[in-house]
Amino acid sequence: MRTQTFPPSSSSSRTTHPKKNRHSSNSSSMALVTPAKSSTGAAPKQSSQSGWDYWTRVYSDDAQTTGTPRDVRISDMLSSESLIRAKLLFLNVPSLPSAHKNIILNLVKRELNHDISIQDVVVVPPAKWFLNFYRPEDALKVMKHLNGYSYRGHILAVRFCYPDGTYGDESALTELVQCTNSAKGRILEKKDIVQDTFAVECWTKTEFDSLKVFEKELTNLLKAHAYLPYHTVLQSMRNLFTCKVQSELSSMFISDALAQWPTGLIRIFNRNVKVVSNTMCLSSSSYYTQRIHDSALEGGCSVHRNSWEPTVPDDIRSEVQLIQYTNSFLGHFGPQNIDVDIPIRILAQSLRGTWPKTGPKLAALLTEISSGFVLINRVLYLSSNLHHHEKIIDNLACFQDDCTDVYFLPLSCTTEDQKGKTVDYEDI
């Protein structure tokens, strides 16, 4: 085996220059050469530049378009409650540590060994679990396997939850699965399990009946088609409920609502009617299911809202969001009478969760959490809006004029001559 050696003289005779000096000399020489080349020839091509320099320039260039921002992320869309098709309630459950969701998900995955899609897990102390499912058949598999299952010394009891708060057994869930398989995501019609989408206390009896009729006619119109253009549906409903031509469906309330805020009126029926981009369809239609699938592949979908809206009422989760939205709302519609005006009552009905569902309760909450709102004589104003300032002055002036009116109070008299006497109310 031969080895190659280098004489020590060769290494010692070579002069070693510091890297810093060598690089500085090279850079200075390049600085001298570069102007001469740029004056005589064209600039070097991008392919000849350093890769790091090129991509640094690309990512730091503000002029590069990054595409239109998505209104909704895929994670937000998948967490929407509108995608829930079945819900299970677990009773007699053990107490769990903070990472309870992962523990429950691992339990389902370990015991079933199936592709189970769970939308969310909600733990309600001390002894309740709620599991939301995208597909009823997944809920049925979990219910069959875990009902009566012994887990950490507890015998689990599983019940099927109707949206109205009542509970059903395995046969009720099986019926829902059969109905879903036969009609592509349609909800049970024999059991009216869909909650009312608007509160009764916010409307008069006539208005409530008109809303019921409007929902029925809107649903019948969409049942005959897979989907319809949004503005086509609005025009059809305007013609149907117009008061210009007297008919059984003529309604001044519906006509005013469609004229003032049609987008908000449609949102009241969000559980059954969906607006996707510029089209409208039923939530149980195959078209809506396909659009959800396509949006998942694209990474998001556009949300139909008015240009003045910072978001949609469905997405309001905090008081800060509610204040921001109501500022834009009152800036667009102007001061709102909390008992009479249609837009503010529609807004109250459009909020989800535990937000107030009537105009007076919503106004009371807004004036409590923010000084930017003022409630005078049952009218809600913006305290920082100049136009609203004028309305407030007019309102107070009218109120003062009403208080200074002269009222006459008849007195109980003993004689016939005194019965006709009256007294000035201000003199009392």
From Swiss-Prot:
Stretches with biased composition (Polar residues): 24-49
Q: Name the segments for region: Disordered.
A: 1-49
Organism of origin is Caenorhabditis elegans
The protein's matches in InterPro entries, at most eight in alphabetical order, are given as: RBD_domain_sf (IPR035979)
Q: Supply the name of the protein.
A: Uncharacterized protein F07F6.1
Molecular functions per Gene Ontology: nucleic acid binding
